[in-house]
């Protein structure tokens, strides 16, 4: 991989996008961004607050702007929010400006990885988390598949191992 192309990580919450993204950026000596953290930095508030005040649609509008700006940079690793693929504009931007890697995980692994996480607004409802995650998977998994250049299952690998797998895939390009 002579030139440093942008690498965009997509997938459901709990797939490891942020953790793997940090590993990948260190291994490849690339700048790392997390779209959710970038939104928090710009608003001065956490994601849950933005969801409460602006609703999911308001949050997604902010997300489109952040993703558009960040993906104009060169040689970055970007971990996107799980729902970023809901907007066609985001899917088009990600597809056009870099290599899209879908980090896939099972509902069981998502439940175990997110059970103590209070920063996930979509898991703060009265509906069971399993039901929420199943509904999100039904809605979003086809969208992840639509734009993914590569798909990697993250359930039984460490973040470091997944990062190395991604690097190996990129070297073959």
From Swiss-Prot:
Molecular function GO terms recorded: ATP binding; magnesium ion binding; shikimate kinase activity
Record has Acetylation as a keyword: no
Cofactor: Mg(2+)
Domain of life from the UniProt record: Bacteria
Catalytic function, reaction form: shikimate + ATP = 3-phosphoshikimate + ADP + H(+)
Keyword Signal among UniProt keywords: no
Compartment(s): Cytoplasm
Subunit structure: Monomer.
Protein name per the record: Shikimate kinase
Gene expressing this chain: aroK
